[in-house]
């Protein structure tokens, strides 16, 4: 069921910037987004980038010790969100980086919010071409342990996420 919600151009720009890893200067790399949240506009007609709800690559090791834990803390406890998380992980064979699309729909969110976010999910997913991993999360217990994301990324072959062993 489509909700008629549209995706703001800035959301698509953020996605494309996160997806394309062109060779960049050190300054450009620091400005790359590691994680970003998207929400519905106040009038519930557009999916927009949520202001100040992001982690930049340059923040890691500076103001952000562990990007995964910091990302989980950005999620609102009582409302839904969409998120992109640029996961850096290691398998038994190699290091990898993949974008993960996350639909955050906690049990404590209002029913109306869960319904409009669920019915608008396809609109944003269609704009995020090439995403390999999608994850619907219904509460902190599902997301606070990084090993759950490790399983989504590659099951038992994933040995670490963001430099931390699983």
Swiss-Prot record:
Keyword rRNA-binding assigned to the entry: answer is no
Q: Which residues carry this modification: Phosphoserine?
A: 3
What's one Pfam family the UniProt record gives for this protein?
Cofilin_ADF
What SMART domains does the record tag this protein with? ADF
Annotated Gene Ontology cellular component terms: actin cytoskeleton; nuclear matrix; Z disc
Q: Does the keyword Electron transport apply?
A: no
Localisation per UniProt entry? Nucleus matrix; Cytoplasm, Cytoskeleton
Coiled-coil residue spans: none
Primary role: Controls reversibly actin polymerization and depolymerization in a pH-sensitive manner. It has the ability to bind G- and F-actin in a 1:1 ratio of cofilin to actin. It is the major component of intranuclear and cytoplasmic actin rods. Required for muscle maintenance. May play a role during the exchange of alpha-actin forms during the early postnatal remodeling of the sarcomere.
Which family does the similarity line name?
Answer: Belongs to the actin-binding proteins ADF family.
Q: What is this protein called?
A: Cofilin-2
* Species of the source: Mus musculus (Mouse)
Q: Top-down, what is the taxonomic lineage of the species of origin?
A: Eukaryota, Metazoa, Chordata, Craniata, Vertebrata
């Amino acid at each position: 069921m489509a909700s008629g919600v549209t995706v703001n151009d800035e959301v698509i720009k953020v996605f494309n910037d996160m997806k394309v890893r062109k060779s960049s200067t050190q300054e450009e790399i620091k400005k790359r987004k590691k994680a970003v949240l998207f929400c519905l506009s106040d009038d519930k007609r557009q999916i927009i980038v949520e202001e100040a709800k992001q982690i930049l690559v340059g923040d890691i090791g500076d103001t952000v010790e562990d990007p995964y834990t910091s990302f989980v803390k950005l999620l609102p406890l009582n409302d839904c969100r969409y998120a992109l998380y640029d996961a850096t992980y290691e398998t038994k064979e190699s290091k990898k980086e993949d974008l993960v699309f996350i639909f955050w729909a906690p049990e404590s969110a209002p029913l109306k919010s869960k319904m409009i976010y669920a019915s608008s999910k396809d609109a944003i997913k269609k704009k995020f071409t090439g995403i390999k991993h999608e994850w619907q999360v219904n509460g902190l217990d599902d997301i606070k342990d990084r090993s759950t994301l490790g399983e989504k990324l590659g099951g038992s072959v994933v040995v670490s996420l963001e430099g931390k062993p699983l």
